[in-house]
């Protein structure tokens, strides 16, 4: 559809800077790309001070379906992700400036009122707890206005804190080279480890928008993968609080900024622990763009800054159950100030707690990735243990999970598993 389409009929009509087609493969759409590279052509131009709507596909490009098995999650092609909309030229933006991204609204597409949460198979993506829960699983969520619920995790309903997982401007050629060098060094230094520690450039499945064959080949060879966030530009930070009313301040490294956005989430818990842990969806985001000239120098900016908006689910400070975790792993081994070990233990304590009500562990793992849980680093100085906490909202359940109330265990159904692994239920 033409990018000139506008929304509304009054003086403040908002145009679409880009629209997507969910019936068409993501790799064939010129407004999308799945690598970071300064040479990817502009998908459109946005004026300094302009507000626009930008449509996005889900981060996998439509690979996950509304079904009751997790075959699609198990076999997802992760060489294709993330599909982002952009990059956009922001008029007057130059290296050294700061791009002010004012998120005015985020919504699902009207003809796609559902999303998904997944646990990747340990052999294809894995996740935060994949040594304990190695099998693929999935939950489908239906949207009802601001609320969501899932047939795969019954007894739960909550308002979404809808947000983009990825916001970023293109790296310069020098910054891209820095990324590739330092991540290659990490891969080499961790070659003895049994897990993937970083993803180097990969030519397979690279999509460079409307680039010609020469530029596409260069992007495929050099382009940075979109999986990690990086300090120089933000990117895939998966910060659940970047919802309506938020402002994000992004460093600009190339002329025109080359801003991209994607990986929209209906809801997410702090940490997005199952990797595909948010409620993933295609959707539309409304953004106002302003350029802060020479902003990087003014702010002494070395990484993005954000101010959260005033919109979030209101449970109240007394309506959470908090679980604690420390740098002692599930085997009893002591680690030194390891917040990742601590947060794994925090997550496991919450999963064990929900087991008492009849949820299987995979259902709870999925839920902790996408529900509006509060994750915090409580202590990071008391050697040898970091202490982390996870706050589970009591009111997302349609039954009482209060600590002092005896737990009533019931059949809570099942999430979706891969068809060749029906016995994955914990």
Region roles according to the model:
Residues 46, 90-93, 242:
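Short, well-ordered loop/turn sites that connect or cap secondary structure elements
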Residues 59-70, 106-118, 256-266, 377-380:
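Short, Lys/Arg- and Gly-enriched loop/turn segments at beta-strand edges
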Residues 105-243, 249:
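Intrinsically disordered, low-complexity linker/loop segments enriched in Gly/Pro
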Residues 196-337:
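Conserved mixed alpha/beta catalytic, RNA-binding, or beta-rich assembly cores of soluble enzyme
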């Amino acid at each position: 559809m033409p990018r000139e389409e506008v929304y509304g009929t009054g003086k403040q009509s908002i145009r679409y800077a880009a629209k997507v087609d969910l019936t068409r493969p993501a790799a064939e759409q010129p407004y999308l790309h799945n690598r970071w590279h300064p040479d990817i052509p502009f998908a459109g131009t946005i004026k300094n001070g302009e507000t626009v709507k930008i449509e996005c596909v889900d981060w996998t490009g439509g690979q996950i379906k509304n079904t009751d098995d997790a075959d699609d999650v198990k076999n997802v092609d992760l060489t294709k992700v993330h599909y982002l909309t952009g990059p956009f030229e922001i008029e007057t933006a130059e290296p050294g400036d700061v791009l002010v991204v004012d998120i005015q609204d985020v919504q699902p597409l009207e003809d796609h009122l559902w999303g998904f949460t997944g646990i990747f198979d340990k052999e294809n993506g894995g996740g935060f707890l994949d040594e304990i829960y190695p099998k693929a699983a999935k939950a489908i969520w239906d949207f009802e206005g601001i609320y969501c619920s899932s047939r795969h995790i019954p007894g739960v309903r909550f308002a979404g804190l809808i947000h983009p997982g990825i916001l970023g401007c293109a790296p310069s050629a020098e910054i891209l080279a820095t990324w590739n060098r330092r991540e290659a060094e990490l891969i080499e230094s961790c070659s003895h480890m049994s897990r993937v520690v970083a993803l180097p450039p990969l030519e397979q499945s690279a999509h460079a928008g409307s680039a010609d064959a020469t530029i596409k080949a260069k992007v495929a060879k050099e382009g940075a993968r979109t999986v990690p966030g990086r300090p120089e530009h933000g990117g895939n930070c998966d910060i659940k609080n970047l919802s309506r009313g938020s402002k994000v301040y992004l460093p600009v490294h190339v002329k025109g900024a080359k801003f991209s956005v994607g990986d929209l989430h209906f809801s997410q818990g702090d940490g997005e622990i199952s990797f595909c842990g948010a409620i993933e969806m295609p959707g539309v985001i409304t953004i106002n763009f302003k350029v802060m000239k020479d902003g990087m120098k003014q702010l002494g900016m070395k990484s993005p800054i954000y101010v959260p908006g005033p919109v979030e689910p209101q449970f109240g400070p007394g309506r959470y159950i908090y679980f604690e975790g420390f740098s002692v792993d599930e085997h009893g081994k002591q680690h030194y100030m390891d917040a990742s070990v601590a947060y794994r233990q925090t997550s496991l304590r919450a999963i064990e707690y929900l087991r008492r009500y009849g949820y299987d562990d995979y259902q709870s793992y999925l839920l902790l990735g996408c529900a509006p849980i509060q994750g915090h680093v409580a202590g990071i100085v008391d050697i040898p243990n970091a202490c982390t906490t996870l706050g589970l909202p009591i009111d997302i359940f349609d039954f009482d999970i209060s600590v002092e109330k005896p737990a009533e265990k019931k059949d809570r159904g099942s999430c979706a598993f891969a068809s060749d692994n029906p016995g994955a239920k914990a």
